[in-house]
Amino acid sequence: MHVADFSFNLPKNLIARYPLPERSTCRLLSLDGHSGAIKHNVFTDILDQLSLGDLLVFNNTRVIPARLFGRKISGGKVEVLVERVLDNQRVLAHIRASKTPKIDTLLLLGDNENIRAIIVARHQIWFELLFDDQRDILTILNDAGHIPLPYYLDRPDYSLDRELYQTVYSQHPGAIAAPTAGLHFDQQLLSALRVKGVEMVFITLHVGTGTFQPIKVKKIEHHHMYSEYTEVPHTVVDAVIACKSRGNRVVAVGTTSVRSLESAIVSVSNSKHTMLAPFCGETSIFIYPGYRFRVIDALITNFHLPQSTPIMLVSAFAGYQHTFNAYREAVNLAYRFLSYGDAMFITNNNSVF
């Protein structure tokens, strides 16, 4: 398929630049991946969509204040986006500047330009920076960094974004973007789900460039995802196996949860069969139409950008035509799109695990 096949008209006014006052009050478009039937609800109706014994799989990564502003020692302005913390002093980062900075360039970062970092290497699209500071990297970022809001919000970050651009269950710092499907869950809704008997487990995928990088090839099959760190612990594997054995559904909260679970599938020796196993490491899995899902039965997700890898994953799960019919209806009914926007609940039940 061609990247252009995943285009659609997204009016700028439908991009939600700010979150709703209450997380769980967004609209919810429910899509049957088999029939293509569409229903319109509010997000709290997810309680009616889930049954006793169903399993929700959340991504508990936490967004770090990864954006630093400053200048080169020579004077040119720079914007640094830290993607990977390598150790207490070194990071991999993206750097925006009028001219590509060279190795050994000294950067003066932070609002007071009192944070010193030197460029020591280049790795593909990232620069390796060495910070000259008594504090560790996460402390520096918490003190001086900005929340890296997506570019399409077209606004600076505010202090409230440090809380609002996080899921209420975020635990492990490391992401440069929120797993946005999870933003709709508040503690009251989570409690109501537990009372109903819906089970919950947590994977970790530190959302990075891989999730949102633009596709620069014409055919999607030629696209390569940059890797992201993920963990699928044995507790998740055990919960998925138990859920399947009792005939319930595994429901992924967000495309990053899908990609983590599917990355944990391994082949059984001397067999055509596969199994889910604990996984800890890098994943560059790219899911697009034609992919055979092995774990999930339903998906909660936001509305995504045209020509993006998340909309390709959704199209693989719900079917290309069903997905774009739903997106056209969402646009016509003025649903709110992207990170702070509305949500979808998609059923399919086609996993083969």
Curated annotation (Swiss-Prot):
Record localization: Cytoplasm
The enzyme's E.C. designation: 2.4.99.17
Highest taxon in the source lineage: Bacteria
Catalytic activity field: 7-aminomethyl-7-carbaguanosine(34) in tRNA + S-adenosyl-L-methionine = epoxyqueuosine(34) in tRNA + adenine + L-methionine + 2 H(+)
InterPro entries: QueA, QueA_dom1, QueA_dom2, QueA_sf
Record's GO cellular component terms: cytoplasm
Top EC class, one word: transferase
Chief location of this protein within or outside the cell: cytoplasm
Pathway(s): tRNA modification; tRNA-queuosine biosynthesis
Molecular function terms, GO-annotated: S-adenosylmethionine:tRNA ribosyltransferase-isomerase activity
Function: Transfers and isomerizes the ribose moiety from AdoMet to the 7-aminomethyl group of 7-deazaguanine (preQ1-tRNA) to give epoxyqueuosine (oQ-tRNA).
Protein name: S-adenosylmethionine:tRNA ribosyltransferase-isomerase
Organism whose genome encodes this protein: Baumannia cicadellinicola subsp. Homalodisca coagulata
Origin organism lineage: Bacteria, Pseudomonadati, Pseudomonadota, Gammaproteobacteria, Candidatus Palibaumannia
